[in-house]
Regions:
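Transmembrane-helix signature of polytopic, membrane-embedded enzymes
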Residues: 95-122, 158-161
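Short hydrophobic/aromatic helix or loop-helix immediately within or flanking a transmembrane segment
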Residues: 46-82
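Membrane-interface transmembrane helices that cradle and orient dolichyl/undecaprenyl
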Residues: 145-161, 193-199
Length: 418
């Protein structure tokens, strides 16, 4: 009996440990009200239109029937977050086990990177703070984690790409932002199948391209082909007010469904760049997260050093293309003001990529992991200090990037006075 229990524990120990840590984070730090700006998407569904941002509300309606009060809406969002916690626990657990299976000596560096993620302000904890709880980002994160799990666990390329494509379309149906904030991570992971062992696998490349074309077509449809069956945002509010007591800001509905990009550029973006100093906020965030950025830079330095040492053709491997996927974030930073929501997956992506390629037995990433562990053994206190430092930082917000970054800016512009 004890042996069976021990075997069971060995099968779930990493996943359960990660799940419990993140669950405690969620229970103890979550906000208690759904974000007001995004509240309408809890009740908007396909009976009111077609296109993006209506899928989640349609699923919710299968359970609540005719009326969704604030308490029930909050519960639904919490359930979505907990499912996301399960998904990220399975992803990290699978990665750790795959690494240990072929290189047990890399266990410490693998677990260390997971701990780094869990402590960081760009971990999934950003999904439940005051700025973001109740947003559709919860489900974008979930789709991203499920896609990574597919790429990790399924070997058949046709089944793998089919599932990733279906999940990608679902992500776009949830919110078009999936194309910019989580799909780049999935493309970076797909490069492991296309450029494995420094040679192009034509079959895998064709499947990846087909998947990408479908995603682009779906994005264009959801971005430009969908809409609501109403002529004015106030009409939408009147209908929704019969279904819920959630806040229903007319501005959010008007901006998303009744205004074009020119209006956004001439009003929101102009004032955002002029008044809220986004590049200054970004610079301060980078300073606060400098220890993490140094880890990332050294990681990629080691990857390319391995390529040079082994005289590998750079563009025959996946690494340049993996780095280029980060450029896909640029349009959403240029078109939207909620930079905190986009920075979190951008920063977190490097950890997922490192662990994914390590789990896939990538030689260059294996070399980078070895060098990383050498540095940790030489300066263990530096790594411990990094974990403790980033653990003190608040999770990323939305339009206000990160609390400590704004506090630093405010101090240097206003001193001690309000």
């Amino acid at each position: 009996m004890m042996k069976k229990m021990l075997n069971l524990w060995n099968k779930v120990s990493y996943e359960l440990g990660i799940f419990l840590v993140v669950l405690v984070q969620f229970i103890t730090t979550r906000a208690y009200d759904v974000d007001a700006w995004s509240a309408p998407w809890n009740v908007l569904d396909y009976s009111m239109g077609n296109g993006s941002r209506l899928l989640v509300g349609s699923i919710y309606r299968l359970f609540y029937g005719d009326y969704l009060d604030q308490v029930e809406a909050y519960r639904y969002n919490c359930v979505g977050i907990i499912i996301g916690i399960v998904a990220v626990s399975l992803v990290f657990g699978r990665m750790i086990r795959m690494v240990i299976a072929y290189t047990p000596e890399k266990r410490n560096v693998t677990v260390g990177m997971v701990i780094l993620y869990l402590a960081a302000p760009f971990s999934m904890s950003y999904l439940w703070n005051n700025s973001n709880i109740g947003r559709l980002d919860t489900y974008l994160f979930l789709v991203g984690m499920l896609s990574l799990l597919v790429l990790l666990c399924i070997k058949n390329i046709y089944v793998k790409m089919l599932l990733v494509t279906v999940l990608g379309v679902a992500g776009l149906a949830i919110h078009q932002a999936y194309a910019f904030v989580y799909y780049p991570l999935i493309v970076a992971a797909m490069c492991a199948d296309v450029f494995g062992e420094y040679k192009v696998n034509v079959k895998n490349l064709v499947m990846a391209v087909i998947s990408g074309v479908v995603e682009i077509a779906a994005f264009l449809y959801f971005q430009f082909g969908g809409g609501l069956y109403y002529d004015h945002p106030q009409q939408v509010v009147e209908v929704l007010s019969q279904r819920t007591d959630l806040p229903l800001p007319t501005d959010s509905i008007e901006l998303e469904y009744f205004r074009d990009i020119t209006y956004v550029q001439n009003t929101l973006l102009r004032s955002f760049f002029a008044e809220e100093k986004p590049f200054l906020q970004l610079a301060v965030v980078c300073v606060l997260l400098a220890p993490v950025l140094i880890i990332y830079v050294l990681m990629w330095k080691d990857v390319f050093a391995y390529n040079k040492r082994e005289q590998k053709k750079l563009f025959c491997g996946p690494y340049v293309y993996v780095l280029l996927t980060n450029l896909v974030f640029i349009p959403i930073f240029a078109m939207q003001t909620d930079w905190g929501r986009w920075l979190a997956p951008l920063f977190a992506g490097q950890i997922f990529i490192f662990l994914f390629y390590l789990a896939k037995k990538d030689a260059a990433m294996y070399y980078a992991a070895s060098k990383m562990w050498e540095r940790v053994k030489k300066a263990p206190l530096a790594f411990a200090a990094t974990i403790m430092w980033i653990g003190t930082l608040d999770s990323f917000g939305a339009r206000s990037f990160q609390q400590q970054a704004w506090a630093v800016i405010y101090f240097f512009t206003h001193g001690f006075h309000q």
